[in-house]
A protein has these predicted regions:
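Face-selective signature of the C-terminal outer-membrane beta-barrel domain
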Residues: 1-3, 29-177
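Outer-membrane beta-barrel signature, preferentially recognizing the C-terminal barrel domain
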Residues: 139-146, 216-248
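A surface-exposed, glycine/aromatic-enriched loop/edge motif typical of exported proteins
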Residues: 5, 45-47, 208, 216-218
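Active/binding-pocket-proximal capping segment
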Residues: 167-172, 184, 213-219, 227-229
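Outer-membrane beta-barrel translocator domains and adjoining extracellular loop/strand segments
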Residues: 5-21, 67-76, 120-128, 175-182, ...
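Membrane-spanning beta-strands of outer-membrane beta-barrel proteins
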Residues: 37, 88-90, 147, 189-191, ...
Length: 248
């Protein structure tokens, strides 16, 4: 459990077309936050025999809740209240099998499932009307993302030369529900991620390694939320539900 208090200040200077200062504004935000989190983990390891065969199973469950309340003042005038309630549940299941062979090589096989679910409920209460009467940043977002991965790798060492070859396939199933507007967005995609490592030992203190791998970075729910959020009149952020993952 953790509690916190934070104050931020944003200063805006407005100039006309001739670069003459016409107005200044100061926006102060006082934020109070309260969060709770809990996590449970279970690990099972079975060394199947003396040759190094091993089976490992991991289970994990975590839950977190956060409540943030903000009071915003502009030029020392109380203009709005914001309240954000966020909660998330994460589940993990992973199984790995290691099989060393008599020729010195080793095979590893595994499966991993990450199941994430979260909700973000943001309420905005303006005390001074916005210049745009249609603007309402209040929103409620459900986000669910399940990632299932199968992977295998094979490695061997010949005297001073060693290599490792691996391949992982991932299925991502993503669901976004905008409860405020009753909109739903679903996306599923599969990716293949190879890994190649080559190593050579010159002596006991010097070696060289070449490696290649492919990785995936998925956008967080914050960057997918299409509702506007403003830290000032001129600083506006809006997510995009159509964002694709990036590969490196």
């Amino acid at each position: 459990k953790s509690d916190g208090e934070n104050t931020t200040s944003n200063n805006v200077a407005v100039f006309d077309a001739n670069k003459v200062l016409t107005d200044t504004r100061t926006r102060n935000e006082n934020e109070l936050s309260d969060s709770n989190s809990i996590q449970y983990s279970i690990n099972y390891t079975n060394r199947l025999n003396a040759t190094g065969k091993k089976l490992t199973i991991d289970l994990q469950y975590s839950k977190s809740d956060q409540d943030q309340a903000s009071s915003i003042f502009q030029n020392n005038v109380f203009v709005e209240n914001n309240n954000t309630i966020q909660n998330s549940v994460r589940k993990l299941f992973q199984i790995d099998y290691v099989y060393p062979k008599e020729d010195g090589s080793q095979i590893e096989l595994g499966y991993r499932a990450n199941l994430d679910k979260s909700n973000s409920d943001y309420k905005n209460i303006p005390l001074v009307p916005y210049s745009d009467p249609k603007f309402d940043p209040s929103n409620n977002l459900d986000f669910e993302q399940n990632v299932y991965a199968l992977y295998a790798q094979y490695g061997k060492k010949y005297d001073k030369l060693s290599y490792l070859l691996g391949l992982r396939t991932e299925l991502t199933d993503q669901k976004i529900e905008l409860l405020t507007t009753n909109e739903n967005y679903n996306k599923s995609y599969i990716g293949l991620f190879p890994t190649v490592n080559l190593g050579y030992e010159f002596n006991d203190t010097e070696s060289i390694t070449f490696g290649y791998s492919k990785r995936l970075r998925r956008p967080r729910s914050y960057f997918l939320n299409p509702f506007e959020s403003r830290s000032s009149e001129t600083n506006i952020f809006k997510g995009n539900v159509g964002l694709d993952p990036t590969y490196t």
